[in-house]
């Protein structure tokens, strides 16, 4: 059994509300636009981190992380990228990887809009945790927690906070 925290689009923010929401997870998965290598290092010092690069992440982050990450968590095949889209509207690069990897859980970010959808065509759960940072179009900051127990994904929770005035 693993407790997972899923975040995206921090754009340099990893503050107390986010840490409090993620304090009991076993791993944090970051779907890109981390903001800086220093932010990634702060997250990784807090909990084990799996991350991908986002479209605004610079060269240092690109040397440390990749655009796509495929891995197994418990009995669930996971594919994570930044610009992924959602069922019936996938980004073409993401769709090619979905065909290749055949994930049961597809994690992406970029839109700053929290969205969780089951895709019956590819038999996967598509998860976008929205934006956990302060930069962007979103009105509230969001993140997701869930439990992966063997092949079962369950107990999904959404964290929601106001944007900082800083």
PLM region spans:
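N-terminal active-site segment of His-dependent metallophosphoesterases
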Residues: 1-49, 57-67, 73-75, 80, ...
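Active-site-proximal beta-strand elements of phosphoester/diester hydrolases
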Residues: 3-9, 77-83, 124-130, 155-158
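Active-site glycine-centered loops adjacent to acidic/histidine catalytic or metal-binding residues
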Residues: 9, 33, 54, 82, ...
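Short, motif-level signal for alpha-helix interfacial/capping segments enriched in acidic residues
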Residues: 10-12, 82, 87-91, 95
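Short active-site segment of divalent metal-dependent hydrolases/proteases
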Residues: 12, 36, 85, 113, ...
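Generic beta-strand structural signal
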Residues: 30, 72-73, 118, 148
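Conserved beta-sheet core of the metallophosphoesterase superfamily
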Residues: 50, 88-152
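Charged phosphate-binding loop/patch that engages nucleotide di/tri-phosphates or the phosphate backbone
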Residues: 149-166
């Amino acid at each position: 059994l693993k407790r997972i925290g899923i975040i995206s689009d921090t754009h340099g923010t990893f503050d107390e509300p986010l840490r409090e929401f993620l304090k009991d997870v076993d791993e944090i998965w970051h779907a890109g636009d981390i903001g800086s290598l220093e932010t990634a290092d702060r997250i990784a010092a807090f909990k084990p981190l799996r991350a991908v690069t986002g479209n605004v992440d610079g060269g240092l982050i690109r040397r440390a992380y990749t655009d796509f990450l495929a891995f197994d968590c418990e009995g669930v095949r996971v594919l994570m990228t930044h610009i992924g889209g959602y069922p019936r509207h996938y980004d073409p690069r993401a769709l090619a990887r979905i065909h290749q990897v055949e994930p049961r859980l597809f994690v992406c970010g970029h839109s700053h809009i929290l969205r969780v959808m089951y895709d019956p065509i590819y038999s996967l759960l598509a998860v976008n945790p929205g934006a956990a940072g302060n930069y962007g179009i979103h009105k509230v900051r969001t993140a997701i927690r869930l439990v992966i127990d063997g092949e079962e994904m369950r107990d999904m929770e959404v964290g929601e906070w106001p944007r900082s005035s800083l």
